[in-house]
Amino acid sequence: MNNFYKNNNNYGYLPFDLKQNHQIPNNAILILDNGDFFLGYNFGSQVTGIGELCFNTSITGYQEIITDPSYSKQIINFTFPHIGNVGTNFEDYESNGSFAAGIVTRQTPTRSSNWRSLNQFDAWLKDLNIPGISGIDTRYITKNIRKSDSTNALIFSSKKNKPNFNELFSLLKEHPSMKGLELSSNVSTKTSYSWNEGVHILLKNFKNKKRKKINSLNIVALDFGIKKNILRNLFDRNVNVVVLPQNSSFEEIMSHKPSGVFLSNGPGDPGATKKETFHLLEKLIKQQLPIFGICIGHQLLAITLGAKTVKMKQGHRGANHPVKNLKSKEVEITSQNHGFVVSKDDLPDDLKITHISLFDKSIEGLEHKSLPIFSVQFHPESSPGPTDSSYLFDKFFDQIIRYHNAKKN
C-alpha cells in the first residue's frame, strides 16, 4: 500500500488527521492542487516550494536538469528512481544556480560515489535552497500529470513545525498557473558578457577544445534563460559570442555588428512575453540576419512570424524523445524540456515544418522559406542527452558564413 492518502479513493490510511496540525511522521509532504497529498522524507533545503509539477524521464544528467533556467517555478518529478548517486561537480552546471521550485524522487539520495563528485546531492540542494522529497511513488505522480491538465504542487518539510494543511492548500491554490506567466526576465542576465569556453572533453580532464576564432564573425545571443552548453556549441563554431539581456534594444544588438542572432531557451509562457520583445524580433527579421532559436526562442520566432503557441497537457521533458527530420527522413533522439508548443493551426505560409515529434506529431522544428531563419523546439546542445542534432549549430554557422560573404561582396 502506498504511503499517501487520496480524497475520493481508498489508496491509503493515515492514523491521524493532517488538518489538525499533527506532526507528519516522515517529515515531508507533497500536496497537489486537486487535494491529493503524499508523505515522504525531506532532503535538500527545509523550505516550502511551490510550482508547476512536471516529470522528467532522463536517467542521467540531474545536475544539468536542475540548473537549467527553463525549470523556473517548477517542481521536477524524476521518473528514474535513483537520483543523486554521483553527486555534483563544477562542470555540469547549465547556469550559475537553479530556479527550480523543488525535487521529487522515489529513493532517498545516498552518499555519492563517483570520481568527479565534489559535493553530496543533499548538501548541494541545501546550498541552492531547493527542497526535495523522497519516498514518493513517482510513477503514480507521472500518471496523475498525464491524466490531468497542468498541476501545481507544494513541498513542505520541517522537523520542528507541524503542517497546517488548510493553510498550505490555500497557499497552493493561490499560486498562478504557468499559462500567462512571463518568467524569462527573472532568469536572464542583467548585463552583457562575452563567452569564450568550448565544449568540455571528458577524456582530456574537461579541458576545452582549442579553437581559432574568426574575429569578424559575431553572434549575439539573447538570453531568455540560456544554458551554458548552448554557448559552448556556438563558440566551437569559430565565432565570437556575446550574450545580451532579453530586454536589449535593437540599437544595442546592432552595435555588436552581428553576423547572426541566437534566441535561447527559457521558462514560462511565450505568449506572455512583453510586446517589446516581439517588436525587437520584427526589426531583426527585417535585417535578413541569420536567426536560430531553441525552445522558447523557437516559440518567440514563430509568434513573431504569425504562428500561435498553446499549452501542452503534460509537456515534453527528458533525454530520450524521438523526433523525425522531415527533410532527411531520419529519426533523431533528442533532449527536450517544454510545456508549450507551436500550434499547427493557421501556420503561416512562409513557415515550413522541418521536424515533428514521434510521440504526438507536434511541431519540433520550423524554417522560413525565404529568409535564413530556423528554429527547433528540442535541445540540440543536449546536456544531458544525445548529440544527434548538433548539426544544427553547423547549419547556423553555414548561414552566417553566407551572410558574411554576401555583405563583403
Q: Where do the PLM segments sit?
A:
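RNA-binding accessory domains that recognize and position tRNA/RNA substrates
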Residues: 2-247, 251, 255-256, 268, ...
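Short solvent-exposed loop/turn micro-motifs enriched in small/polar/acidic residues
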Residues: 21-24, 316, 348-349, 358-359
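Short clusters of small/polar residues that mark proteolytic maturation junctions
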Residues: 42-43, 80, 314, 336, ...
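Proline-centered loop/turn at the N-terminus of a beta-strand
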Residues: 131, 218, 290-292, 308, ...
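Active-site glycine-centered loops adjacent to acidic/histidine catalytic or metal-binding residues
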Residues: 137, 295, 338, 379
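Cysteine-nucleophile active-site neighborhood
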Residues: 255, 260-333, 339-344, 385-404
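Catalytic beta-strand/loop cores that center a nucleophilic Ser/Cys/Thr
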Residues: 329-371, 378, 408-409
